Amino acid sequence: MDNQHRKISGYRELIQAEIDLMNKIKALGPQIEAVLVEVANHVTAQWSVAWQAEDERERLQMAGPDYWLGQARGDLQVGLMKLTRAVAQPTTF
């Protein structure tokens, strides 16, 4: 397929090395998502135990692992987007 970016306003044509780099960045997404799912499953298991142990429930409420997991998900998505923009170098907002 011909380089599509020349038809997208604000994007330049990418050379093969840049396309390869973009594909490496994009390949990280599913790997990172898999780790996020593992952490989510771990936290869910902790909450299951915590409902039967008040001290553990209080600890989890104070630690806020669900909050931090959500923050990590968003930050990692933003990080991957920033990497792709660093390679593609669009000139539009």
Predicted stretch roles:
Residues 43, 54-86:
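Short, charge-rich amphipathic interface segments used for partner binding and complex assembly
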